[in-house]
């Protein structure tokens, strides 16, 4: 995952010229060398565009705004950076694709207004990059957390037709084909590939193995977001690590406005944090591996049955199931003892059930 300010020295990027941070490119080169050594394709994810593209705090936009679309200079800097990547890596076979750009136009009332500007950005980016690199695949993100893809209704790479859609989905998405129907239809109409650019999140084994089974059925690759957060419910990764004993002093100050640690004290905590990252101090989540790698011993929940009739399920019904799950299959569901879905239209008042309730079926 790449943040643009790691690679481009913005203060010097004036008059359509740019100065680049060679140390950052050297680190990326080391990663690509490692990928070649171990035969692991690299998807270079442009996760933060100049001036911000999503409205989400993680892309580091000023005031969390999507200024990429309104600021001509910032958009030009992004084009320059992309062109620089093409020059440096056009012959690097280990790069499988470029994933552009993370969850654009996601938290804003200006979505409809800005979407045409995003379309222009994608079209112009590909046009300029193709003058240098005619080989690599471009994976484009939809709006609203990469979920809305309706505007991919025409050819974005007219000369080479080497592009696809990057979708994101975590456990709040119901694990059924209906959740992917819109983007699958778009990919089918445009004759392009689907890539799940982000998925994983919490250790919801039932959700993950069901969703990955669907993706495999529709020939969609998927990328496990292998490190999401340090602590809490979202902490799910191949390797986890312990935080320093005084880590709470940092988070209490940053999140709750508690007393600010001194510079020296904060630096000591961060130094301890870095020491905790050493691989030999991490814990490997081996129970997580079978679900992610689709090998070894693991279970696919009953709700992840293959859609082909009479193959992995039996019991078609003329009545839809009360849980509202995979209604198009007309499959009669049998619930675990003690689970009683609310009848459609008669649900008790209160919060809507979390989609993960489906794993109780």
Model region roles, listed by residue range:
Residues 1-33, 37, 335-361:
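Active-site-adjacent substrate/metal-binding segments within catalytic domains
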Residues 1-3, 14-97, 121-128:
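An active-site-proximal structural segment forming one wall of the substrate-binding cleft
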Residues 4, 173-175, 232-233, 307-317:
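Short, solvent-exposed loop/turn elements at domain surfaces
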Residues 7, 45-46, 198, 226:
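Residue-level recognition of beta-strand->loop/alpha-helix junctions
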Residues 11, 49, 103:
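Active-site loop signature of alpha/beta-hydrolase-fold enzymes
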Residues 79-83, 87-229, 237-249:
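Extracellular glycoside hydrolase catalytic/binding regions
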Residues 214, 218-299:
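Extended, alpha-helix-rich binding/interface surfaces that flank or overlap catalytic cores
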Residues 279-361:
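Extracytoplasmic
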């Amino acid at each position: 995952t790449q943040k643009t300010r790691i690679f481009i020295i913005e203060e010097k990027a004036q008059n359509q010229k740019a100065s680049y941070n060679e140390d950052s490119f050297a680190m990326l080169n080391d990663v690509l060398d490692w990928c070649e050594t171990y035969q692991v394709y690299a998807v270079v994810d442009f996760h933060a565009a100049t001036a911000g593209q999503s409205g989400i705090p993680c892309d580091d936009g000023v005031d969390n705004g999507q200024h990429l679309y309104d600021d001509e200079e910032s958009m030009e800097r992004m084009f320059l950076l992309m062109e620089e990547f093409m020059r440096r890596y056009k012959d690097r076979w280990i790069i499988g694709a470029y994933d552009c750009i993370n969850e654009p136009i996601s938290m804003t009332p200006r979505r409809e207004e800005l979407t045409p500007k995003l379309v222009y950005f994608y079209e112009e980016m590909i046009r300029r990059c193709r003058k240098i690199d005619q080989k690599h695949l471009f994976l484009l993100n939809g709006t609203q957390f990469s979920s809305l893809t309706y505007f991919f209704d025409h050819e974005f790479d007219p000369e080479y037709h080497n592009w696809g859609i990057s979708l994101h989905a975590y456990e709040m998405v119901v694990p059924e084909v209906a959740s992917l129907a819109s983007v699958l239809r778009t990919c089918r109409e445009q004759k392009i590939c689907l890539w799940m650019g982000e998925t994983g999140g919490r250790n919801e084994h039932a959700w993950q193995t069901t969703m990955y089974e669907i993706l495999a059925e529709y020939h969609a690759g998927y990328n496990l977001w292998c490190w999401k957060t340090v602590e809490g419910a979202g902490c799910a990764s191949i390797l986890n690590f312990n935080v320093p004993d005084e880590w709470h002093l940092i988070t209490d100050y940053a999140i709750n406005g508690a007393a600010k640690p001194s510079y020296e004290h904060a630096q000591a905590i961060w130094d301890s944090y870095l020491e905790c990252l050493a691989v030999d101090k991490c814990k490997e989540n081996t129970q997580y591996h079978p679900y992610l790698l689709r090998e070894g011993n693991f279970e696919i929940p009953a709700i992840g049955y293959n859609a082909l009739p009479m193959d992995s399920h039996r019991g078609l019904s003329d009545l839809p199931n009360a849980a509202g799950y995979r209604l198009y299959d007309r499959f009669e569901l049998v619930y675990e003892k003690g689970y009683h879905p609310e009848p459609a239209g008669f649900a008790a008042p209160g919060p809507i059930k979390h989609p993960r309730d489906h794993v109780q079926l």
